[in-house]
């Protein structure tokens, strides 16, 4: 356990001018040892591993990174079909929606199934009235008549297929985001899923405090699908498996899916219990792509993630959601229910927008013209990472195909299927036991599992909250240990053990062994 791509900025500033914080254990994050070896500095290091990865993407431009991807990703040991390749099913497509859309002909003239709007007024009450008025003037409807529009890709074959809803995040509301997930919608359909890109563009633009509305709208779409599954006149009658549902969300949509999953288990809206809930859909898995976290806090708490499997992916070069917000969601997700797992993947050189083909490589609006984009993965490379891991995760958690479990424990098991860059992964399935969470007390010498923590020769040793990057200085809501050491020869990474050490001494049987 040690640092990865970087450590919190305030710790980095504590190092000597012109140096980078360093420290890693070989084999934990392939390539990071070579990245850090030339550095000469006292080295503050944040523990545990993935929490440190979450704190920073890369502390310097990529010219300082020596990639070992050709070696690390040279083999594939997973004994299962490559989920990143097209599946065996032919894909068909249709659109459902209001049939009255003022701005998009596809939801006006091309809908195969017409839908009724829903009244979302309670979920938008906290938003500036003037901003909403201008918005509704553009769209031609208001909060009392929010449309349920969706683009559907499905297997053009007989059978019963799981349902996957995909929802975009915030963007210019006049540059429609929902077409940007056709790449994953078609891919999932070829693998035997009914994939829907949900339109929530009317919630985009310069408004805030709307993420509960985004999540609630997803559940309103699921209500349509539950009714359609029992309707013999529906185009996919008898082919929708509503007991196996997954939600996939990008950016604010990545938080909206956690909100939807939380609302799905509740009997009332937390913000106003006069509004009853009765959802109870068969949501099994959440897939979050560079999500935000904490924009909506029901009962002044972060939305819980319980009773579902959770996967989050984030890019090191994300210039929109610059901190790995989804790592905080990952940390609080529980996997105590049978069959649930959680996993995260951090992708070096991936940005925010290329997961959506409409958004592209410009993460920060007009200012994006000054970004050095040569360091980014190409859009197709970035989306191929998504095809492999999103499809593999749904195979594992929605279909129950255990052959794909190893790729979430260690991404190197599918190295031959991945674009050549660097990755860091984390996984939990309920079988883990915490040795030291640094949250049991304020004593640096105690461990969660009992026993004692001892150290020698450190220049820094303390425990504390792990902050995110950025001006807001939010935290990951988890504690870590900060360690520093200085090697006589200056190479703090490969320093001999007697320079400094840190160990957790556990009592017999602390981990269930004899």
Residue ranges and their predicted role:
Residues 62-70, 78-79, 349-351, 358-512:
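Alpha/beta-hydrolase-fold serine-hydrolase catalytic core, especially in secreted/extracellular enzymes
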Residues 62-159:
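Short conserved active-site loop signatures built around small residues
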Residues 159, 209-255:
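Gly/Ser-rich "nucleophile elbow"/oxyanion-hole loop immediately N-terminal to the catalytic nucleophile
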Residues 160-169:
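Short beta-strand element of the alpha/beta-hydrolase
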Residues 177-219, 223, 341-344, 348:
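Active-site machinery of serine-nucleophile hydrolases
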Residues 254-266:
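Short glycine-enriched nucleophile-adjacent loop
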Residues 268-291:
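A conserved short beta-strand
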Residues 303-380:
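Active-site-adjacent alpha-helix of alpha/beta-hydrolase-fold enzymes
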């Amino acid at each position: 356990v040690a640092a990865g791509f970087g450590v919190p900025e305030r710790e980095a500033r504590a190092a000597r001018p012109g140096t980078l914080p360093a420290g890693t254990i070989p084999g934990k994050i392939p390539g990071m040892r070579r990245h850090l070896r030339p550095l000469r500095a006292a080295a503050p290091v944040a523990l545990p591993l993935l929490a440190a990865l979450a704190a920073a993407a890369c502390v310097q431009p990529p010219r300082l990174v020596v990639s070992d991807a050709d070696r690390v990703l040279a083999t594939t040991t997973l004994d299962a079909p490559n989920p990143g390749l097209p599946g065996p099913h032919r894909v068909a497509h249709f659109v459902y929606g209001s049939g009255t859309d003022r701005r998009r002909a596809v939801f006006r003239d091309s809908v195969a199934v017409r839908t009724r709007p829903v009244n979302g007024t309670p979920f938008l009450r906290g938003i500036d009235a003037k901003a909403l008025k201008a918005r509704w003037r553009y769209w031609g409807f208001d909060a009392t008549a929010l449309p349920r529009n969706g683009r559907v890709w499905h297997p053009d074959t007989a059978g019963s297929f799981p349902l996957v809803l995909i929802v975009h995040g915030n963007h210019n509301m006049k540059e429609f985001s929902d077409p940007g997930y056709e790449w994953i919608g078609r891919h999932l359909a070829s693998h035997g899923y009914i994939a829907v890109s949900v339109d929530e563009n009317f919630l985009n633009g310069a408004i805030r405090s709307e993420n509960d509305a985004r999540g609630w709208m997803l559940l309103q779409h699921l209500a349509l699908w539950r009714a359609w599954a029992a309707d013999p006149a529906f185009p996919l009658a008898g082919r929708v498996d509503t007991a196996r549902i997954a939600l996939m969300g990008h950016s604010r949509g990545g938080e909206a899916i956690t909100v939807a999953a939380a609302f799905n288990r509740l009997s009332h809206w937390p913000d106003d219990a006069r509004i009853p809930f009765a959802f109870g859909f068969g949501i099994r898995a959440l897939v979050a792509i560079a999500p935000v976290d904490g924009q909506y806090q029901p009962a002044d708490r972060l939305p819980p993630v319980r009773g579902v499997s959770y996967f989050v992916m984030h890019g090191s070069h994300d210039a929109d959601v610059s901190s790995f917000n989804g790592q905080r969601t990952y940390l609080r997700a529980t996997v105590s229910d049978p069959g649930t797992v959680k996993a995260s993947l951090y992708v070096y050189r991936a940005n925010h927008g290329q997961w959506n083909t409409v958004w592209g490589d410009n993460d920060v609006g007009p200012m994006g013209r000054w970004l050095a984009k040569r360091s980014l993965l190409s859009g197709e490379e970035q989306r191929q990472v998504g095809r492999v891991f999103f499809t593999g995760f749904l195979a594992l958690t929605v279909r129950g195909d255990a052959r794909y479990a190893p790729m979430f424990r260690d991404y190197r098991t599918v190295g031959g299927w991945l674009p050549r860059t660097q990755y860091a992964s984390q996984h939990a399935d309920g079988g883990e036991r915490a040795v030291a969470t640094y949250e049991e007390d304020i004593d640096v010498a105690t461990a969660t599992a009992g026993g004692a923590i001892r150290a020698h020769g450190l220049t820094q040793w303390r425990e504390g909250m792990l902050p995110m990057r950025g001006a807001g200085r939010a935290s990951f809501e988890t504690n870590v240990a900060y360690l520093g050491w200085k090697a006589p020869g200056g190479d703090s990474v490969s320093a001999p053990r007697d320079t400094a050490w840190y160990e957790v001494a556990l009592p017999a049987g602390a981990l269930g062994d004899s």
